[in-house]
Amino acid sequence: MNILQEPIDFLKKEELKNIDLSQMSKKERYKIWKRIPKCELHCHLDLCFSADFFVSCIRKYNLQPNLSDEEVLDYYLFAKGGKSLGEFVEKAIKVADIFHDYEVIEDLAKHAVFNKYKEGVVLMEFRYSPTFVAFKYNLDIELIHQAIVKGIKEVVELLDHKIHVALMCIGDTGHEAANIKASADFCLKHKADFVGFDHGGHEVDLKEYKEIFDYVRESGVPLSVHAGEDVTLPNLNTLYSAIQVLKVERIGHGIRVAESQELIDMVKEKNILLEVCPISNVLLKNAKSMDTHPIRQLYDAGVKVSVNSDDPGMFLTNINDDYEELYTHLNFTLEDFMKMNEWALEKSFMDSNIKDKIKNLYF
């Protein structure tokens, strides 16, 4: 890992009016996307890796020895998309093959932080599920957490704190070791390391877990849960429960808010931010196309949204690909992107002193 990098010349607001994206090539635009001081709130650390890193893990542990590198990527990942969130979850469970020991988990955390830094992210909230990382090889969640915290801390310090990183804990559904209550207890035990609590995996109505989420929130840990992502669900109950029962401050994805004026009004009134993951939504068939992605409607309606990469390892993308897609297909401007990042900063669960520092530096 080559830490020595040219510092990024981040964009200032006063520069934006002098930049004409329409006259630029795609390569030139990517240089601009990198210079946006990005605040990313929704990225699964356990699914954040490069193709090279993933293949090296598969080879290291002699998994799938009869498959070529390209076949390995096709077998495990979701870069070509699929039929649904359910199909994605099944593939993600396969990816847990690489969580063989604590060394690879620490390495994954290091690479994830460094890659986000190279992409121009200045505030990064990673989230991970202790039970998901642990279940395949029956690892100890305490040692998993130690490895992740150690890996993050080491790279953040090597980068002289030019990227600020925090963790959210996920209690999930969809794999054999999933246990929301155990994950909530783990989150509160390590409250010094976790800035928020989430639910991920299969999208379910969480009202039956109200007691657990109340317990976490009342202990001082804010909530953001996955809801309003899965278009195969017959109604919008997951969103209503997240907002009215769980009292979340943010929603992971939330794009189905666009289907209801009542929900649009509700998230605006309660100042709830939607952590939108554009490429993820298209690849999982939760948005029919980028041209018709609901983020445009939501943004125009005054809903606070932010741009996120979700599971970049599964998609073989990075956060700047999401910016390129939103510009190319939905005509979002640099001013729009700066505003979204200001919203993300405002709604981040990180310490207010760090947020103030980032605001003064970049916004």
From Swiss-Prot:
GO MF, one annotated term: 5'-methylthioadenosine deaminase activity
Any one GO BP annotation for this protein: purine ribonucleoside monophosphate biosynthetic process
Keyword Mitochondrion in record: no
Alphabetic keyword roster: Hydrolase, Metal-binding, Purine salvage, Zinc
Enzyme category, top tier: hydrolase
Superkingdom per UniProt: Eukaryota
Region (Gating helix loop): 170-184
Assigned GO CC terms: cytosol; external side of plasma membrane
Gene3D superfamilies on file: Metal-dependent hydrolases
SUPFAM superfamilies linked: Metallo-dependent hydrolases
Pathway info: Purine metabolism; purine nucleoside salvage
Ways its activity is controlled: Inhibited by coformycin and methylthiocoformycin (MT-coformycin).
UniProt: Zn(2+) binding residues: H42, H44, H226, D310
Protein name, as recorded: Adenosine deaminase
Source organism of the structure: Plasmodium vivax (strain Salvador I)
